[in-house]
Amino acid sequence: MPVKPATRDYHPARIERASSKTKRTTTPAKRLVLPRNKTNLDLEIEGRVVKLTNLGKLFWPELGITKRDLLQYYADVSEVLLPHIVDRAMVMKRYPNGAAGDFFFMKRAPSPRPSWIELCSIWHGSGNVIDFPIIQDLPALLWVINLGCIDLNQWYARCDDVDRPDYLHFDLDPVPGATWENVLQTALVVRDALDSLGMPSYPKTTGSKGIHIYVPIVRGPTQKQVWTLAKEIAHVLASANPELITAIYKVAKRPKGRVLVDYNQNAWGRTLASIYSVRPTPKACVSTPVTWKEIEKGVRIEDFHLRNVRKRIEKLGDLWKPLLDKKKRFDLTPYLK
């Protein structure tokens, strides 16, 4: 139990580790290939058994992409994906009938579940304690995807201190009437603003409609402090570029044809689709890290999808690997009020 109760700005958390009898693994020694002649499968990975079900179910009927294909994709990219999501609470967004079907959010890890699934128990100000699953390794990743999760939505703060995030970020979202070219232009405006502050910035496509821009930060500021700074930056950009950018959060008040620089996703408990997440879009697009040069050249959302991102990773590696380097994190302290 927490030493003191949760408040709006303080949320105790506890990690429930896996059974000591099970060994954590990241990726298998050789590429994991799921058989195509089985509908259900008990898959053993270094002593852990993952039950995979309904492998032949079409998740994208028009593309011929099955649940097996989705699981295979995540197995293939797990080596570069897992370092970005370990030790973080995961909000599950489940699509049991595929990308075009109904979905529902699920925060609490379902029971029964394998003994090797680790939990992040977070105390909320309401008094509730929510046991979120943590994806620590390949078996846990496949277990979550098998539940019908198409994309992954992890917290920005690690479970050992859920009030202090590792990132400041912006979600660039086109308001009706705005074009993709407007989104690209906005991304460059945000980049230049962050550059002027000395902040390193890393873009990725959302896989849906926009661009995410992340700044890796030295852990220390609270989520509220990070949100406040992101809000200030967004409003300054909107004031300087009124025909291009809006920072108005209320939908009814947003001017048409602008790009929302959404700072509000920095709020406590919010999530964005993770790096390398497949999105439930008609083309199975993937949220993919890109270079600023690619942004300048006009990269498009549909350039990256479930069937080609693996080859991109083989060629370029993980473009977001610098976000994992503690030495490359930016200290926000001088900008905090």
What is the role of each PLM region?
Residues 34-145:
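Charge-rich, low-complexity segments
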Residues 76, 185-190, 228, 232-236:
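Long, highly charged amphipathic alpha-helices
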Residues 131-206, 216-225:
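Signature for HUH/AEP ssDNA processing cores
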Residues 92-95, 201-207, 248-252:
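Short beta-strand
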Residues 51-56, 209-215:
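Short acidic (Asp/Glu) and glycine-rich catalytic loops that position anionic groups and cofactors
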Residues 1-65, 69-71, 82, 86-87, ...:
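C-terminal accessory nucleic-acid interaction domains of nucleic acid-metabolism proteins
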Residues 212-218, 259-263:
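A short beta-strand motif that forms the metal-chelation/ATP-contact edge
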